[in-house]
Amino acid sequence: MNSLFASTARGLEELLKTELENLGAVECQVVQGGVHFKGDTRLVYQSLMWSRLASRIMLPLGECKVYSDLDLYLGVQAINWTEMFNPGATFAVHFSGLNDTIRNSQYGAMKVKDAIVDAFTRKNLPRPNVDRDAPDIRVNVWLHKETASIALDLSGDGLHLRGYRDRAGIAPIKETLAAAIVMRSGWQPGTPLLDPMCGSGTLLIEAAMLATDRAPGLHRGRWGFSGWAQHDEAIWQEVKAEAQTRARKGLAEYSSHFYGSDSDARVIQRARTNARLAGIAELITFEVKDVAQLTNPLLKGPYGTVLSNPPYGERLDSEPALIALHSLLGRIMKNQFGGWNLSLFSASPDLLSCLQLRADKQYKAKNGPLDCVQKNYHVAESTPDSKPAMVAEDYANRLRKNLKKFEKWARQEGIECYRLYDADLPEYNVAVDRYSDWVVVQEYAPPKTIDAHKARQRLFDIIAATISVLGIAPNKLVLKTRERQKGKNQYQKLGEKGEFLEVTEYNAHLWVNLTDYLDTGLFLDHRIARRMLGQMSKGKDFLNLFSYTGSATVHAGLGGARSTTTVDMSRTYLEWAERNLRLNGLTGRAHRLIQADCLAWLREANEQFDLIFIDPPTFSNSKRMEDAFDVQRDHLALMKDLKRLLRAGGTIMFSNNKRGFRMDLDGLAKLGLKAQEITQKTLSQDFARNRQIHNCWLITAA
């Protein structure tokens, strides 16, 4: 009897143990990452040929303590290598693990290689050659703390390399994991199986091989036992012949069918090639089809299983499309696949909850470094009186109501950008802004007292409901997470896409960027203030301080301002402002753009203006500003400097976003100024629910 070890992916050990026992293995013992077992020579070959779950089958040769590199060398040399393979065979060493002595795996592999070579040369035998790429013998050494475990890898290449798949493409799952997913899916061979996001077809091919009794090792060309001195070619040929006979019989007798689809024509072509190489192409129908076009191929036929490994995303901007995808799949399953089973393998359990289905079973597994879950569902058959499940129903109803109200109003006003929803319902704490045919959903960061998983799930529900109610394509929704406005949050860079969208606001054309920054380049709550500036600016010299992207300057210029001066510390935003001006035909010397610390520029400027707009940050301590700025503390000093630049009869429009801001009216009076609050006049319908989003004042000479 041989003592053997089969390695596998984490989470699949018990499944592998059952498989090995069914093959005839005895004394199976599960450990993390694999199964120890015993079997005769025939079982060695059968486990290699038939195991769908093992990553490698290894023959342990011994262990040694490693307190020095000499210990490793002597421990390896103590094994009788000349009984393991002939000197004419090539070999390679795979070394993993480190300790205080062996701190580099390459060094460890070199010491093992030296010990093996010396074992031959000391017996006056020819020196065996090393072949790292295609060796006849693979030696595996695993160092854990002070113990090195040495084994012969009888697999050669990993057993997931079945021989049917083109390795050039990126594979989301290995064949061994795919086989485990099939086994855990609840699918019964002989019933239909469908994968609507099949990629290169691995799940379907593994299922078809399982169903037709086709050994996973049947198409492999190389094995790790070819140079093994104890290899029994006669027994191997018997095992191989039996596998070929069973495969022919299984294919001839199998009557059910497999269905795969994917939106990418290139991967479908690869899937067809893989199925042909696996010998089961006649059983699988592959189609180029998006999930949105998914239909039940057997409406009147037997119930089957939908099995898939859907995409998931780690980037925030990919989530809306994935949420929409999972929500759509859930709806299609309920509408067209009543009575079927569904099994999905995913690295994002939160996305699976978008299906709006209750899982009957779930399994955990590792896909490389990723923690994954597989959930199995039974889709109930629909009845005539069954109603479709609503996602975030309260939120969806409010959004639908707001849409009906604001869409008509915005059209009449001549604006394309407006707020549709602003945390109207406390449990759905987001803002939803429309920019032409795009939508930006901003999630206000939830309090730490809110369970993070629940908050994330609610956000997913919001996105699914938003896409459904507004009828937009998922790629037209942009998701952002932010805290309530603080300091210079609007200057935070998020991306580098550089994609700008042209929008209209009354008679102005403006560029917005929905993806690269926390804000979009257009503060929607200041829309009426900008229109007022346009109406007040005819024939006047206009100054815009803390100008951001210059949208207020555009309105002033279109309103007939004699000149405009736009000042901001950011070169990025000044260039943006210049693009906005150019888009509206406002070019030339009459329209100046100045990059400067606004407060320092204000103290030094000696020009005169008829109309000044200033919208400073609530607080700023930018390294490029000379002093920290607090709008509540410093607004009077600001007005003192502004008064010096204000021409007789001129007006300052002063706005800020500080909640609870108090204007120092007495201090203004001492400066010879007076203030009129116009906040309510500057709040349009879409911001009427949030009366503290900004405050706005007109300041003139007393």
Swiss-Prot record:
Keyword hit for Ribonucleoprotein: no
Catalyses which reaction(s): guanosine(2445) in 23S rRNA + S-adenosyl-L-methionine = N(2)-methylguanosine(2445) in 23S rRNA + S-adenosyl-L-homocysteine + H(+); guanosine(2069) in 23S rRNA + S-adenosyl-L-methionine = N(2)-methylguanosine(2069) in 23S rRNA + S-adenosyl-L-homocysteine + H(+)
Family annotation (CDD domains): AdoMet_MTases, THUMP_AdoMetMT
Documented EC number(s): 2.1.1.173, 2.1.1.264
Residue ranges occupied by any THUMP domain in the UniProt entry: 43-154
Recorded family membership: Belongs to the methyltransferase superfamily. RlmKL family.
Function summary: Specifically methylates the guanine in position 2445 (m2G2445) and the guanine in position 2069 (m7G2069) of 23S rRNA.
Protein name as it appears in the record: Ribosomal RNA large subunit methyltransferase K/L
Species for this entry: Shigella boydii serotype 18 (strain CDC 3083-94 / BS512)
